[in-house]
From Swiss-Prot:
Residues 1-33 form a transit peptide. This is Short/branched chain specific acyl-CoA dehydrogenase, mitochondrial. The modification N6-succinyllysine is found at K70, K284. Among the different mitochondrial acyl-CoA dehydrogenases, acts specifically on short and branched chain acyl-CoA derivatives such as (S)-2-methylbutyryl-CoA as well as short straight chain acyl-CoAs such as butyryl-CoA. Plays an important role in the metabolism of L-isoleucine by catalyzing the dehydrogenation of 2-methylbutyryl-CoA, one of the steps of the L-isoleucine catabolic pathway. Substrate binds at S183, Y229, Y283, N291, E292, G293, R294. It comes from Homo sapiens (Human). Pathway: Lipid metabolism; mitochondrial fatty acid beta-oxidation; Amino-acid degradation; L-isoleucine degradation.
Length: 432
């Protein structure tokens, strides 16, 4: 299968360009600042530079970033408001993600994927989030959690069975959290009891993202509660398995187009062959995937904040009060400069964590830093943007209030901000 960049570049020729008109409909894509347009990585060693800037990308990464930006503006932006109001992701958006190759970015071409870099995944999530954070997290979960776990821990048979489906048509869902297992995720109560060649799952899960559309559920259940978290094991459960019940989607503040549902398991029989990896290693797999996933969430929050910022700045440059532009007031200039600096810092933290992961270097502390900081900054940025736009920013006629609502989840899911601070402090303690 030809690479993602090639396919996207071919498709991009069919996409028309859109430019923001100040205070036009929020379906129109936002202005993009020059500072966020990074250059491709060209002749670095020839120029005597041994270490490229973090915002310098390979040709493939630049093509992916550019093509996903066009896809998001053309095919997602016109539907964002409707999807938010209806709490439903449009089928055309999901189909588009698969058709563009965005649901199997790092998966080997042997299984129908693209075989691109982890930073490519980060760039895709960031660009999608500039337009709609719901679509971004839909893509993020598939790539950083589901695909990654199967790629790393699946048997050859499991890879051959599931990866081609996950890259072309099937949505995956990661099932860890429970009513009594949120931040304390390994206090889960879902059981998996062995009966012959099967394991029988009983219990429930909460806050399961993408559950409404998922065809495959990666479920964490305990095969031996007497040994605590060391009994947690990963199971691959197909949607049509008898006894698996998917509840009504939650009515959420933000990320409304991304379904979040409770699940119930009533004597769900799962073949022993559907155990992912080793028995009792589920907690290790979950920790590992969440460490990577936190970089993905950092990218989501970064993109969300940048998208909101890009939409707002043209307004304050054109809005006239007291005979001059809002942007000409020094007090507002300082606020804008402060937010822009924070966005740049969040971007560098996120890209650095991604590059460390790609290089096989320790990255857990840096991933937590990126996730923590980007999430906090997303909340601050979107709040400021509403203030800068004034009354219109508070209405649903424009996207700023949605960015604000979507941003809040960043400090909560895939490890709350305080959990990230705990992780960072733990590593600092060990370093000294």
């Amino acid at each position: 299968m030809e690479g993602l960049a090639v396919r996207l570049l071919r498709g991009s020729r069919l996409l028309r360009r859109n430019f923001l008109t100040c205070l036009s409909s929020w379906k129109i894509p936002p202005h993009v600042s020059k500072s966020s347009q990074s250059e491709a990585l060209l002749n670095i060693t020839n120029n005597g530079i041994h270490f490229a800037p973090l915002q310098t990308f390979t040709d493939e990464e630049m093509m992916i970033k550019s093509s996903v930006k066009k896809f998001a503006q053309e095919q997602i932006a016109p539907l964002v408001s409707t999807m938010d109001e209806n709490s439903k992701m449009e089928k055309s958006v999901i189909q588009g993600l698969f058709q563009q190759g965005l649901m199997g970015i790092e998966v080997d071409p042997e299984y129908g994927g693209t075989g691109a870099s982890f930073l490519s995944t980060v760039l895709v999530i960031e660009e999608l989030a500039k337009v709609d954070a719901s679509v971004a997290v839909f893509c993020e979960i598939q790539n950083t959690l589901i695909n990654t776990l199967i790629r790393k821990h699946g048997t050859e048979e499991q890879k051959a069975t599931y990866l081609p489906q996950l890259t072309t048509e099937k949505v995956g869902s990661f099932c860890l959290s429970e009513a009594g297992a949120g931040s304390d995720s390994f206090a889960l109560k879902t059981r998996a009891d062995k009966e012959g060649d099967y394991y029988v799952l009983n219990g429930s899960k909460m806050w399961i993202s993408s559950a409404e559309h998922a065809g495959l559920f990666l479920v964490m259940a305990n095969v031996d509660p007497t040994i605590g978290y060391k009994g947690i094991t990963s199971f691959l459960v197909d949607r049509d398995t008898p006894g698996l019940h998917i509840g009504k989607p939650e009515n959420k503040l933000g990320l409304r187009a991304s379904s979040t549902c409770p699940l119930t398991f009533e004597n769900v029989k799962v073949p022993e062959a559907n155990i992912l990896g080793q028995i009792g290693h589920g907690y290790k797999y979950a920790i590992g995937s969440l460490n990577e996933g936190r970089i993905g969430i950092a990218a989501q929050m970064l993109g969300l904040a940048q998208g909101c910022f890009d939409y707002t700045i043209p307004y304050i440059k054109e809005r006239i009060q007291f005979g001059k532009r809002l942007f000409d007031f020094q007090g507002l200039q300082h606020q804008v400069a402060h937010v822009a600096t924070q966005l740049e810092a969040a971007r560098l933290l996120t890209y650095n964590a991604a590059r460390l992961l790609e290089a096989g270097k320790p990255f857990i502390k840096e991933a937590s830093m990126a996730k923590y900081y980007a999430s906090e900054i997303a909340g601050q940025t979107t709040s400021k943007c509403i203030e800068w736009m004034g009354g219109v920013g508070y209405t649903k006629d424009y996207p700023v209030e949605k960015y604000f609502r979507d941003a809040k989840i960043g400090t909560i899911y895939e490890g709350a901000s305080n959990i990230q601070l705990n992780t960072i402090a733990k590593h600092i303690d060990a370093e000294y």
